[in-house]
């Protein structure tokens, strides 16, 4: 059964406490990545209704630090489903609830694999993108997947047709 991308949306909110920060009072990157992994896993599970495991995390760049006492908002949504894997796009914002403003902190792509009861990969539902953003993310997901597979040594560069097309247009 195909499912809408919007059906997988997870919004997670956390308050940055002293134990979450480094000596500069900024949210530690590892703590944010932990929260992002949870949000992405929940989005993947909503999509496939099965246990999932993290297969990969794309490059994460931290644009703006999130300070102690600020709020972290994480949005996670499945962008595309393949045979047993799903790409999840995450957007992260910080919010100063006292000053009443939000700012973008970062975004990333995670890949999850659905598992059957024996722990083996199992097929997942296809995604139906509806909004323009969902369609763009869906269309570009195959290129990102091929790059991940090449970097992980699971695909030869000469077999990456979508990726090669970027350089031959």
Report residues per predicted region.
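Membrane engagement elements in two modes
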Residues: 2, 16-17
